[in-house]
Structures are given as structure tokens and as C-alpha cells.
């Protein structure tokens, strides 16, 4: 689960990390009140959306007066922001974060993320802060350093020393940097975070570290023990179909293609998407029905997929292990009879009672229902139907 920058900064403050004074506004009246409460003449105004790349897309403004700040607030609120990380149609800006400007002498990129390959936590830093870390990795990889932290041991002083040397920061600041890192590490561990990214972390003229921007993402599976984090969820930032899927306990991610997918098992779902891509099609979604591979579960999945008008065909790919294919077939027939589909359905079944299941589907006489016992051929048929070639 992602949260907004202003929410991440509230968490940082609770854990003793310096952030500039600021507040969030949803309208111009609130923006004016916030500006009257802030000091100085330089202000940063930032669109609050769950996507990176805001600056280059015009979602971050630096104002040199309160009057200019109000003008920027008027432009930002209600705009649709399109970045490389948003859907094609962009995201509507409903909130902006306004904070005091800071004078600083150094910008640093810093993040904590989990490395599945090493099964350790990666502490990533770059001397080139305030810019895209992906671009830095491509153009100046020597400016990035990654330190692996064993979660059984934790973040240690020698890690901080290693960073001090790499960043060429005055060693007198060791204690301040170590305290900052320890506080970020506590958030990462105690709150079951997937990612904490500070870009940039700045060193001010009076040698204090400040988080100028903050991004946090948390493990959805651990939210049951973090009600304070769950309460920060902003459903306006995710697709309505994804919100509906969560309510129905379906693992669903909306994509850009025209082949709707209903699959049991995340691995098989990803393999299905790969095959569709290889055959020249594009998946409209990732959908793992998992334990919901029942008649009711399939019907829910169909309704969810058909909310997307770009879907031209539904490809059902089920491997019956514990789940019996004949029960799945009965569920598919029930779903097709109870839900007006309007698009063809291709069903590939394999595993327990697959032959009986395919016979049931063939004998159902349902219009637009196609069957296959071969994954490749089933996917090929789905792609052809999506393109109108059959």
C-alpha cells in the first residue's frame, strides 16, 4: 500500500526525522491559511498523488512569494497530472502539500528496500540526489552505493561509516547521520514497509539533515497489525476495479490490454500474461482468483474484468490441483448464464477431472464459449478473438 508524501512526513516526524514545516491543502482557502502560518518567502507546493515524476510533469512548484504560491496552488488543485508512473489518463490532483523552502548545500538520494535475491534489506544511497535514481543508475552508476543489511543483525555503525566515506560528508556528522538511518530503519522494520525513499535528503547550511521528499510503501499482507497505516489508504489513487477486487479478496491489477485473464495461482497468471504477449496480444489485467476458483469466484472475476470496456475476450486458465476442474466448469457455466458477458470466453482447463470439465463446457451450448486443453493454443485463440481475426 502506498501513501502520500504528507502522510510519510508525519511518520518521519514521529520517529525524529527532520522535515520542513508544512501542511496539506484541498482548496485555496486552506492553502492561504497554511501560507500565513509558514515563515520565509520561499515555498514548495507539491501535488499529492501516488506516482513519481511529479516535478518533470509540472506537479512541483517553487514560489518566491505568498502571492505566487496562491497562483501555483490554483493551477495545481484540480489538474490532471500525467507522469511515467501514472495511468495514461493521469491522476486528478485533489490535494497539495505546501512547505517552507530550505537552503541546503548537498542533496542525497537514500532508500531502504527489500532485495529478494539476497533476502536482505538494501540501503541505497546516491551522491546525485533530487533526480531520478533510474536515470542515475543508467548514466552515472558510480554515484550509487548499495549496502546489504542482514535483518537478523540490523543496521550497524559501520554501515553509517561506509556511507560517510562514500558521500564524502564531514565525519563530525557521523552521529547525526547514524541517528537518521537508525530512525528510518525502525520505521521500515516496525511498520512492515516495502520501501522508504527520501529523494532528496538534504544537508542544510547549519549541518542538519532534512527529508525534503518522502515516499513510503507498505506490505499489504501485514496491514492487519498496523491499523494506523491502513487508515492512511487513499482509494482515489487506485483504480475502482482494484478497490472492488480487494473487497472481494481477489488479486487484481488493471493493465492496458484487451485480453481479460482469469487464472488461479500467481505464477500461472504471470506465465499466461507472458504467452499472450508473445503471441502478439496484451493482457487487460492480472487476476489470480486463488482459492476463490469457484462458481461464485469466477462470476465475480468476470464482472470485475467486464468493468473495463477495452476487454474484447476473457481467457480463463485454470490448473486443477486441489480444485477439481469439473467444479470450475460448473462455475463457469453458471457465471456465463448469470452474467451477460458480451465478449467471447476461452477456457483452458488442465488437471483433476479436466476431461469431464471440458466435456461439460462443450455440451453447455453456450454462445461464444470456446475450450482448449492446451495453454498455448488457448492463448492463441484468445489473442485472435481479441483482434477480431476469428
Swiss-Prot record:
This is Succinate--CoA ligase [ADP-forming] subunit beta. One of its GO terms (cellular component) is succinate-CoA ligase complex. Its EC number is 6.2.1.5. Heterotetramer of two alpha and two beta subunits. The keyword Transferase does not apply. Pathway: Carbohydrate metabolism; tricarboxylic acid cycle; succinate from succinyl-CoA (ligase route): step 1/1. Binds 1 Mg(2+) ion per subunit. ATP binds at residues 46, 53-55, 99, 102, 107. It comes from Campylobacter curvus (strain 525.92). Residues 9-244 form the ATP-grasp domain.
Amino acid at each position: 500500500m502506498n501513501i502520500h508524501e504528507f502522510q510519510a512526513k508525519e511518520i518521519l516526524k514521529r520517529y525524529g526525522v527532520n522535515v520542513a514545516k508544512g501542511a496539506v491543502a484541498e482548496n485555496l482557502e486552506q492553502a492561504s491559511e497554511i501560507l500565513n502560518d509558514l515563515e520565509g518567502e520561499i515555498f514548495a507546493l507539491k501535488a499529492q498523488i501516488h506516482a513519481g515524476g511529479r516535478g518533470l510533469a509540472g506537479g512541483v512548484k517553487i514560489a518566491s512569494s505568498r502571492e505566487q504560491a496562491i497562483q501555483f496552488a490554483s493551477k495545481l488543485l484540480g489538474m490532471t497530472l500525467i507522469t511515467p508512473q501514472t495511468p495514461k489518463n493521469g491522476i486528478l490532483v485533489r490535494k497539495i502539500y505546501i512547505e517552507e523552502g530550505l537552503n541546503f548545500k548537498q542533496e542525497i538520494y537514500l532508500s531502504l528496500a527489500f532485495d529478494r535475491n539476497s533476502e536482505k534489506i538494501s540501503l541505497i544511497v546516491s551522491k546525485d540526489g533530487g533526480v531520478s535514481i533510474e536515470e542515475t543508475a543508467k548514466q552515472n552508476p558510480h554515484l550509487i552505493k548499495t549496502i546489504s543489511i542482514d535483518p537478523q543483525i540490523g543496521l550497524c555503525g559501520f554501515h553509517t561509516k561506509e556511507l560517510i566515506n562514500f558521500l564524502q560528508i564531514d565525519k563530525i556528522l557521523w552521529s547525526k547521520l547514524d541517528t537518521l538511518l537508525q530512525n528510518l530503519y525502525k520505521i521500515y522494520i516496525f511498520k512492515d514497509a516495502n520501501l522508504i525513499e527520501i529523494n532528496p535528503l538534504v544537508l542544510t547550511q547549519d549541518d542538519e539533515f532534512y527529508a525534503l521528499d518522502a515516499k513510503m510503501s507498505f506490505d499489504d499482507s501485514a496491514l492487519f497489525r498496523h491499523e494506523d497505516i491502513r487508515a492512511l489508504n487513499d482509494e482515489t489513487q487506485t483504480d475502482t476495479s482494484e478497490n472492488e477486487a480487494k473487497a472481494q479478496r481477489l488479486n487484481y491489477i488493471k493493465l492496458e490490454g484487451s485480453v481479460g485473464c482469469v487464472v488461479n495461482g500467481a505464477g500461472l497468471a504471470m506465465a499466461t500474461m507472458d504467452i499472450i504477449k508473445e503471441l502478439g496480444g496484451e493482457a487487460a489485467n492480472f487476476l489470480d482468483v486463488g482459492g476463490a476458483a469457484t462458481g461464485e469466484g469466477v462470476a465475480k472475476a468476470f464482472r470485475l474484468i467486464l468493468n473495463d470496456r477495452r476487454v474484447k475476450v476473457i481467457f480463463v486458465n485454470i490448473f486443477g490441483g486441489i480444485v477439481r476442474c469439473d467444479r470450475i466448469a460448473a462455475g463457469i457455466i453458471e457465471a456465463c448464464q448469470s452474467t451477460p458477458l458480451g465478449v467471447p470466453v476461452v477456457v483452458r482447463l488442465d488437471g483433476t477431472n479436466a476431461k469431464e470439465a471440458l466435456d461439460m463446457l462443450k455440451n453447455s451450448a453456450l454462445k461464444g464459449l470456446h475450450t482448449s486443453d492446451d495453454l498455448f493454443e488457448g492463448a492463441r485463440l484468445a489473442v485472435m478473438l481479441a483482434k477480431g481475426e476469428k
